[in-house]
Amino acid sequence: FAKIVGFPVFYVILRLQMESLLDNINSPQDLKKVTVAQLPQLSMELREFILDTLSVKPGHLGASLGVIELSIALHYFFNTPEDLLIWDVGHQCYAHKILTGRKNNFHSLRQLNGIAGFPSREESEFDAFGTGHSSTSVSAITVMAIANRLQGKTNKHIAVIGYASIVSGMALEGLNHLVSTDLDVLIILNDNSIGIDPSVGALKEHFFELENGSKNSIFENFGFHYKGVIDGHSFDELFSAFE
């Protein structure tokens, strides 16, 4: 407090509290009721929710915090769980889990009988495949797309694969198989340049060149329709790429 003309004056600082968006979201259907203009606020709330939980629970912060906007955009734009979504590695899935009905149990993350640290098909229909470490997503989403085509289904198929995962033999085998088909599959490379160990090798250098404007893409050389590098924290760029 301060004294003015001999009288104590108390200053009370009030922070304007915005109505919580996350409190009202327990499914992608709830998410779609939010306007696009409100999505940045929801991103902030999701980050705070995850940080608050993991300040007292074990878990992996970096991978999930890096895909907050992507997680929101995927469930906002696509029709999950009918549209199949695979996260590889599974550490990226925290926001996905919170948005798909597991928010109220998220405090039990990685505890006995609690929320799994990775996607789990036994846990939720939104977890299309049980991914852990790592590199299985491309092959899995390919065979799911083949199976759905044989059944006459027209749903979408999306795999989000990390920077360190896509350089593995299994992921490259999956890309080699997928490009030989005409399946409607979307592969999203989360190139955050982060792995357990420092990234090394030819693909590391190639991804760096792509980020700096190189037009010679390994993915186009494979035969994929390659959208290019986008800002994964920009809803405008994400929705444009999905279109």
What are these regions (language model features)?
Residues 3-14:
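Short, positively charged and aromatic/hydrophobic N-terminal segments
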Residues 11, 88-90, 190:
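Structured loops at beta-to-helix junctions and adjacent beta-edge loops in soluble globular domains
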Residues 12, 74, 213-216:
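Intrinsically disordered, low-complexity boundary segments flanking structured domains
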Residues 18-98, 231-239:
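N-terminal amphipathic, basic-rich helices that act as targeting or association modules
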Residues 18-21, 27-30, 57, 61, ...:
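Glycine-rich, flexible loop/turn motifs
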Residues 20-27, 49-53, 116-128, 215-224:
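Gly-rich Lys/Arg/Thr-decorated short loops/hinges at beta-loop-alpha junctions or inter-strand turns
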Residues 42, 60-181:
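Cofactor-binding active-site loop characterized by glycine-rich and histidine/acidic residues
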Residues 127-243:
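Glycine-rich ThDP/TPP pyrophosphate-binding loop and its adjacent helix/strand module
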